[in-house]
Amino acid sequence: DAQLRTEYSVKALTDAGVEVEQLDLQRGDWDRNKGQEICQNDLAKYGDQIEVVFCNNDDMAIGALQAIQAAGRTVNKDIYLVGVDALDAAKNEVAKGNMTGTVLNDAKGQATQAVECMEELLGGKTFEADHQSVYVDYVKVTPDNVKDFQ
């Protein structure tokens, strides 16, 4: 899931016509301190070349935010920061303008889809071998809609 998150985040930018140069890709092990350390090191190495930081969870994004602020950069002004999970702490940072956004891994949508698949199976429907996975779209949480999720 995390590899796909990264791949499709970059793809969304390129599909929108944004030129992308990936400066670094590291594992933050879902850890705030590691996210801060990686971002701090990258900011020291790449400086203003860094325009966007994608983190595959909000805790790492909050760590990255700490590094960004310590480096004197301003999210949504000279750098963008996106996390995943729509944790309360991240939604608060989005509302304050300190994060560009987060992405909700839609548990309610997943549950609904699971029930629909179960009903289809109980009704006798079979699924082909190459259709064994069902993907539920993530939900973007931005400053424009964050109040809907708090």
Predicted segments with their positions:
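Flexible loop/hinge segments that line or gate small-molecule binding clefts
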Residues: 85-100, 139-141
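Class I S-adenosyl-L-methionine
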Residues: 7-17, 65, 69, 95, ...
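Conserved beta-strand scaffold positions in the cores of enzyme catalytic domains, especially
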Residues: 22-25, 81, 102, 140
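Short beta-strand elements at the ligand-binding edges of bilobed clamshell
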Residues: 25, 96-108
